[in-house]
UniProtKB/Swiss-Prot annotation:
Major subcellular location class: membrane
Positions of modified residues (Phosphoserine): 114
Annotated transmembrane regions: 11-36, 60-88, 152-178, 239-268
Record-listed Phosphothreonine modification sites: 116, 118
Annotated function: This is the major myelin protein from the central nervous system. It plays an important role in the formation or maintenance of the multilamellar structure of myelin.
Protein name from the UniProt record: Myelin proteolipid protein
Keyword Cytoplasm: no
Source species: Oryctolagus cuniculus (Rabbit)
Disulfide bond entries: 184-228, 201-220
One cellular component term from this protein's GO annotations in UniProt: plasma membrane
Amino acid sequence: MGLLECCARCLVGAPFASLVATGLCFFGVALFCGCGHEALTGTEKLIETYFSKNYQDYEYLINVIHAFQYVIYGTASFFFLYGALLLAEGFYTTGAVRQIFGDYKTTICGKGLSATVTGGQKGRGSRGQHQAHSLERVCHCLGKWLGHPDKFVGITYALTVVWLLVFACSAVPVYIYFNTWTTCQSIAFPSKTSASIGTLCADARMYGVLPWNAFPGKVCGSNLLSICKTAEFQMTFHLFIAAFVGAAATLVSLLTFMIAATYNFAVLKLMGRGTKF
């Protein structure tokens, strides 16, 4: 079998659901982690510049922000590795399912690819044999992991539940900034509200961002409007929105992974193949 024919068969047997989910996962995590990190930094600057002059008032908030930023670093690394592993699992189980139905002959394609990589059996020295042996060991170890789709279904299900909480929490800063922006719109257009401009405020203490004894803790009237007009506020608001969208995209990708893995696992069990290929 030629290399082109082998590649064509591999493309036909590609797990497109896993490919789409992987791309969506990487995009969502990058958006969530990158924008979320910068949005937290912007929030820290806004709080210490406009809402409190005493470092003791927002010291705890800064520690929490820094802790979340370190968590973001770990989240990005974890999802990069786990997404790649889920993609490999998608190729592995989808190939097995299509081999059952006769749509995709993984053994033939695998032989063609192996012959292309190792250069065939003829004329191969000890170095080539050593490399081939190392590759076989790696594939064998990887196959032990990928040969248990039930574990991936369980882990992905638990991860989806956890990420659902992350998605809900990512909506909180969007809600706070949206309320602040709405208050600024009321100040900018007094005809839309019957309240006095001086009584329209954004109170960081009300959301638990600052303790109740923080001073001033809130900004009202024209001072609040001037804050909303700053590029720093606008950028932070939009970064939180982007992080929220990234969390939603990641949640959709995890659901897609879980559905695809569950389907493949169910087919393999029903066809009596078990989880060993």
